[in-house]
Structure formats: C-alpha cells, structure tokens
A protein has these predicted regions:
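Single conserved hydrophobic/aromatic residue that forms the stacking wall/gate
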Residues: 1-7, 11-12
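Gly/Ser/Thr-rich active-site loops/lids in small-molecule metabolic enzymes
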Residues: 8, 61, 65, 105-112
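A short acidic, glycine-rich active-site loop
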Residues: 13-21
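Active-site-adjacent substrate-binding region
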Residues: 22-90
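His/Asp/Glu-rich mid-to-C-terminal helical/loop segments that flank catalytic regions of hydrolases
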Residues: 93-131
C-alpha cells in the first residue's frame, strides 16, 4: 500500500456503503501509466492495526485505505455528480504508518500532479463527456 497512486474503481465504507466510480472518468484516469487501479476502503479512523487492515483486505479486496473518500463519494452520489477518486498512498496502514506518512508524504506529489493534469486534458477532449 505504500508510495503509490491509486485510481479507485469503488469506495467501500462497509457492505452497505459502496460507491462506484464513474466508468468514463476512471478509464480516462487509468490511461496514465503512473496510476494503478484498485478498491479504496474508507473509515473514520487512521488505520494502523495490522489485523484490522488484513480484515479489510480479505472482506473487501481493498488496495488502499483513507478517511475522507466515503464522505465525498456520498455527496457526489446524492447530488448526481460523477465521482472518481485518485489517492496518493503515503503509508502501509500498519504500526509504522505515522512515521511512514512523514517520510513518504512528498514522494508521489509530482506524479499525482502529472496524473491530474493529464486527466483534466483528457476530460476536456473526451467527446463522450460532451455529447
């Protein structure tokens, strides 16, 4: 889970709260070679427990975990706004997560900036989004 960029096909809060990413936006984002596809788990806690992490991976097949995406996905879903999540993963969600976050926070920023610029260009030139 560390120092990578994930384009999330879905955001999973628990079995009842699963938000699918917009397929067109996800396809456009995943055209960038610096992005890997995955499932994003999300919750109201900083994931540092290895057993809890293993449980999320086994139950939901997640690639990464964060604390914000479910709220954003929920608002988008309720308002009918296409949703996509691109995440810079900064730690392995284990007992060393706090230290890893500090060390790796800037490692993927340039790549994420490039992915976003490329995605915005693809969105603006994608006929399927404008017709």
């Amino acid at each position: 889970m560390s120092a990578s960029l994930v384009g999330s096909e879905m955001c999973i809060r628990d079995r009842e709260w699963v938000y699918q990413a917009d397929k067109t936006l996800l396809r456009l984002a995943l055209a960038h070679p610096g992005l890997q596809e995955g499932k994003l788990g999300t919750g109201d806690f900083f994931l540092t427990d290895v057993d809890r992490k293993r449980d999320y991976i086994e139950r939901f097949g997640i690639t990464a975990f964060d604390m914000e995406t479910a709220a954003i996905a929920s608002v988008c879903h309720k308002c009918g706004i296409p949703f996509i999540c691109l995440r810079k993963i900064s730690d392995d969600a284990d007992d060393s997560a706090t230290e890893q976050y500090r060390e790796m926070n800037e490692r993927a920023e340039d790549t994420l900036t490039n992915v976003l610029q490329d995605l915005f260009h693809r969105i603006l030139t994608e006929d399927a989004l404008w017709n």
